[in-house]
Amino acid sequence: MSRAAGHRPGLSAGQLAAATASPLLSLLLLLACCADACKGVPISPQRLQPEQELQLWNEIHEACASFLSIDSRPQASVALRELCRIVMEISQKPQEQSEKDNTKRFLFHYSKTQKLGNSNVVSSVVHPLLQLVPQLHERRMKRFKAEYQSPSVGQSKGYFLFRPRNGKRSTSFI
């Protein structure tokens, strides 16, 4: 087969390289998009440490950002640009996921119960501000008892604990 038969007429060397790379890049793009969904993708027995994974994502993100910022490459294929855009979107998802994990961890910490020693007493871990609720209740009850035991209190005063039900505030409540 002659050399001229394998050469497309009217294409420069750069255009020929881009044209032959386009199907390969399309295949890479397809594999990158479907890698997590495929059951047959080999998984490394040694997973990356979180620091290594974060460093890898940062390097990929920087490489794609620099590639997309350079507009002087007209021979770069559309598929490669799309691949970089997808990688940049994926690199932002782990940060969002870690924020969700922190929120879940916070909520779990304040909703879980723990057993103390060998006793059967179960105490719940509460938010520090919620620990003030019993003190506020004690203050209210002391104020109510002081108001109720004063000599000027009439019979109708004990019917409402803190304020009338129609929403009007009494002068002694303020």
Swiss-Prot record:
SMART domains: NMU
Keywords associated with the record: Amidation, Cleavage on pair of basic residues, Neuropeptide, Oxidation, Secreted, Signal
Residues recorded as bearing Asparagine amide in the entry: 166
Residue ranges the record assigns to the propeptide: 38-105, 170-174
Signal peptide: 1-37
Family, per entry: Belongs to the NmU family.
Protein name from the UniProt record: Neuromedin-U
Origin species: Mus musculus
